UniProtKB/Swiss-Prot annotation:
This is ATP-dependent protease subunit HslV. The lineage of its organism: Bacteria, Pseudomonadati, Pseudomonadota, Gammaproteobacteria, Alteromonadales. It is an enzyme of class 3 (hydrolase). GO terms for molecular function: metal ion binding; threonine-type endopeptidase activity. Keywords: Allosteric enzyme, Cytoplasm, Hydrolase, Metal-binding, Protease, Sodium, Threonine protease. The gene is hslV. It comes from Shewanella amazonensis (strain ATCC BAA-1098 / SB2B). InterPro entries: ATP-dep_Prtase_HsIV_su, Ntn_hydrolases_N, Proteasome_sua/b, Proteasome_suB-type. Na(+) binds at G157, C160, T163. One of its GO terms (biological process) is proteolysis involved in protein catabolic process. CDD domains: protease_HslV (cd01913). Allosterically activated by HslU binding. A double ring-shaped homohexamer of HslV is capped on each side by a ring-shaped HslU homohexamer. The assembly of the HslU/HslV complex is dependent on binding of ATP.
Length: 174
């Protein structure tokens, strides 16, 4: 799987992800880009789960963003509805972490849209490690969102065998 972490602090939101693609116990690729900018660069998105599944979801989510003029919550809810009801989409196994200047959300394959506490998201196989690290850094340091996301992803990569140290980081200031 992978690790994706999103941190919001001081008018900045960041989504960061590692680059490892695994097939069973084998590393197939180490530099995959699992974090992207969508909707004219105003929305950040990262995925954990099957790579092909996630690209399908990115395309669908971007279409929903266009349909709803970039309104993140509305697009997320509409994607989640489709994910629950469409037979093809229901088979996709991935999680999306998405954020814009106002909200950070997790979109699940069960059709859930979750707005996390403290605007902190950590998903994927190393998500628990990244979340613990990011929480500690948020509560005990004055580091910015970018530094917290990067450090928590590094810690997750040191612990989780399905997470490596290749990082893709996107940030949005508002």
């Amino acid at each position: 799987m992978t690790t994706i972490v999103s941190v919001r602090r001081n008018n900045q939101v960041v989504i960061a992800g590692d680059g490892q693609v695994s097939l069973g116990n084998t590393v197939m690729k180490g530099n995959a880009r699992k974090v992207r900018r969508l909707y004219h660069g105003k929305v950040l998105a990262g995925f954990a789960g099957g790579t092909a599944d996630a690209f399908t979801l990115f395309e669908r989510f971007e279409a929903k963003l266009e349909m709803h003029q970039g309104h993140l919550m509305r697009a997320a809810v509409e994607l989640a509805k489709d994910w629950r009801t469409d037979r093809m989409l229901r088979k996709l196994e991935a999680l999306l972490a998405v954020a814009d200047a106002e909200s950070s959300l997790i979109i699940t394959g069960n059709g859930d849209v979750v707005q996390p506490e403290n605007d902190l998201i950590a998903i994927g196989s190393g998500g628990n490690f990244a979340q613990a690290a990011a929480t500690a850094l948020l509560e005990n340091t004055d580091l910015g969102a970018l530094e917290i996301a990067e450090k928590s992803l590094t810690i997750a990569g040191d612990i989780c065998v399905f997470t490596n140290q290749f990082k893709t980081i996107e940030e949005l200031s508002y």
